[in-house]
């Protein structure tokens, strides 16, 4: 029988890394798909996906289960996408292509 997200989260909070790895396997594709839809670039979407799971792992002790794990994970991913978009808008002029004279 497959463990639920809630069971895997509880085990992960108890220090079971294998349970967190199961959550990654379960949610990696949907999180990547979300990041790709928002950002539109494969490499950057992969980075956001990886950062999402890193942030989730670090914040897991504070996860109280008031929302579904998937909702919490999607919110982390969307916040990281928003941060990525903001950084792109603030790219320095030196990174922009020069006009041909």
Please give the residue ranges for each predicted region:
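Arg/Lys-rich amphipathic alpha helix in sigma70-family domain 2
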Residues: 61-65, 75-95
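Internal acidic/polar
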Residues: 1-5, 91-101
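Short, hydrophobic secondary-structure boundary micro-motifs
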Residues: 20-22, 35, 64, 93-96
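Sigma70-family region 2
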Residues: 13-14, 40, 53-68, 87-88
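Hydrophobic side chains within well-formed alpha-helices
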Residues: 5-8, 19-20, 48, 69
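Structural recognition of an alpha-helix C-terminal capping motif at a helix-to-coil junction
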Residues: 33, 47-54, 67-79
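Short, charged helix-capping/linker segments at alpha-helix termini
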Residues: 13-22, 32-51
């Amino acid at each position: 029988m497959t463990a639920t997200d809630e069971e895997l989260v509880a085990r992960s909070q108890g220090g079971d890394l294998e349970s967190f790895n199961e959550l990654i396997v379960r949610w990696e594709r949907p999180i990547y798909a979300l990041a790709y839809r928002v950002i539109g670039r494969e490499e950057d979407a992969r980075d956001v996906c990886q950062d999402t799971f890193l942030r989730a792992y670090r914040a897991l002790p504070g996860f109280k289960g008031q929302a579904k794990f998937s909702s919490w994970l999607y919110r982390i991913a969307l916040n990281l996408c928003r941060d990525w978009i903001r950084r792109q808008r603030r790219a320095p002029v030196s990174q922009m292509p020069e006009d041909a004279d």
